[in-house]
Amino acid sequence: MAGAAEDARALFRAGVCAALEAWPALQIAVENGFGGVHSQEKAKWLGGAVEDYFMRNADLELDEVEDFLGELLTNEFDTVVEDGSLPQVSQQLQTMFHHFQRGDGAALREMASCITQRKCKVTATALKTARETDEDEDDVDSVEEMEVTATNDGAATDGVCPQPEPSDPDAQTIKEEDIVEDGWTIVRRKK
C-alpha cells in the first residue's frame, strides 16, 4: 500500500508542476526575471512549496489556496496576479489534491495530461512608445508597456490561453446597445 501512496504523491507532484508551468502569470514572471537572477530556481521551488502546503493542510478552502499562491507570487516574484487566473489555478490544484486524497491516480494522470496539452507558451515583450508633446520641442514622454502573446501548438492568440466558453445560460453577456458612444458599458441587473 505504501507503494501506491508514493505513486499517488508523485502523480500529485507532477500535476502541481504541470499546473504551475502552464500558468501564464508565473511564466511571464520567470521569463522576465521578476524573481531576480534565481527566478528559474524559485519556480521549481514553488512546486515543492505548494505540494508541502497541501500535505500539511488537508482541509484547505479555495480562498486559502488563492491567498497562499498570491502571497508566494508577491513575495518571491514581486508579481500581483490580476488576470483572473489565480482562482483557476487554485481550483486545479485543489481538485488534484482531492484526487490524491482519494488515491485516484488515473484522474491525477488525466488532469496533468490535460493541463500539459492546454499549456500555452506566453511571451511578454516591452514596447517603447513615444509621444511628442509639441512638434517644435524635443521633449518626449516615454511609456513602457508590455505586449503579451500566447501560443498553443504554434497558433498565436492575444492575451491568455483560450478557455472553454461558459455553458451557463444565465451568464451575463454584453449587448451592443449596452455600449454607449463614450465607451462606457451599461450594466443591467438580472430580472
Swiss-Prot record:
Residues 149-172 are annotated as: Disordered. InterPro entries: Pre-rRNA_process_TSR2. Keywords: Diamond-Blackfan anemia, Disease variant, rRNA processing. The keyword rRNA processing applies. GO terms for cellular component: nucleus. Pfam families: WGG. It comes from the Eukaryota. One of its GO terms (biological process) is maturation of SSU-rRNA from tricistronic rRNA transcript (SSU-rRNA, 5.8S rRNA, LSU-rRNA). It is linked to Diamond-Blackfan anemia 14, with mandibulofacial dysostosis: A form of Diamond-Blackfan anemia, a congenital non-regenerative hypoplastic anemia that usually presents early in infancy. Diamond-Blackfan anemia is characterized by a moderate to severe macrocytic anemia, erythroblastopenia, and an increased risk of malignancy. 30 to 40% of Diamond-Blackfan anemia patients present with short stature and congenital anomalies, the most frequent being craniofacial (Pierre-Robin syndrome and cleft palate), thumb and urogenital anomalies. Belongs to the TSR2 family. May be involved in 20S pre-rRNA processing. This is Pre-rRNA-processing protein TSR2 homolog. It comes from Homo sapiens (Human).
